[in-house]
């Protein structure tokens, strides 16, 4: 029984890490985000010298 308790946090941590993934869109985010995480998108410039923007999305708890 003690062994099982020790391995649980590790499995949970791995699951959380796999949920925080980058994507180009939040459409159908249920396939890419794990509950209760939500998908957040924002625009950012590609580089300091460029005015071109790209959309970034990520799963987050906040």
UniProtKB/Swiss-Prot annotation:
- Main location, first listed in the record: secreted
Q: Where, subcellularly, is it found?
A: Secreted
- Tissue note: Expressed by the venom gland.
What Gene Ontology cellular component terms go with this record?
extracellular region
Q: Which residues form the propeptide?
A: 1-15
Record's keyword terms, sorted = Calcium channel impairing toxin, Disulfide bond, Ion channel impairing toxin, Knottin, Neurotoxin, Secreted, Toxin, Voltage-gated calcium channel impairing toxin
Q: List the disulfide bonds.
A: 19-34, 26-39, 33-59, 41-57
Q: Which domain of life is it from?
A: Eukaryota
Q: Which residues form a coiled coil?
A: none
GO molecular function annotation: calcium channel regulator activity; toxin activity
Q: What does this protein do?
A: Modulates Cav2.1/CACNA1A voltage-gated calcium channels (P/Q-type currents) in rat cerebellar Purkinje cells and hippocampal CA1-CA3 neurons. At saturating concentrations (>10 nM) decelerates activation kinetics and slightly increases peak amplitude without affecting deactivation kinetics. In vivo, does not cause death when intravenously injected into mice. In rat models, through its activity on Cav2.1/CACNA1A, has an ameliorative effect on memory defects provoked by hyperstimulation of N-methyl-D-aspartate receptors (NMDARs) in the hippocampus.
Domains (record comment): The presence of a 'disulfide through disulfide knot' structurally defines this protein as a knottin.
Record-stated family: Belongs to the neurotoxin omega-lctx family.
User: In the UniProt entry for this protein, what further remark is given in the free-text comments?
Assistant: According to the nomenclature proposed by King and colleagues (2008), 'Gsp(267)' comes from the species name 'Geolycosa sp (strain A267TDLS2-KZARNA)'. This species has been reclassified since that study, as indicated in the work of Oparin and colleagues (2016).
What protein name is recorded for this chain? Omega-lycotoxin-Am1e
> What lineage, starting at the top, does this entry show?
Eukaryota, Metazoa, Ecdysozoa, Arthropoda, Chelicerata
């Amino acid at each position: 029984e003690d062994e099982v308790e020790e391995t649980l946090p590790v499995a949970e941590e791995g699951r959380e890490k796999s949920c925080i993934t980058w994507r180009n869109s939040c459409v159908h985010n249920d396939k890419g985000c794990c509950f209760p995480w939500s998908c957040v998108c924002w625009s950012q410039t590609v580089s300091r010298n460029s005015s071109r923007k790209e959309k970034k999305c990520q799963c987050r708890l906040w």
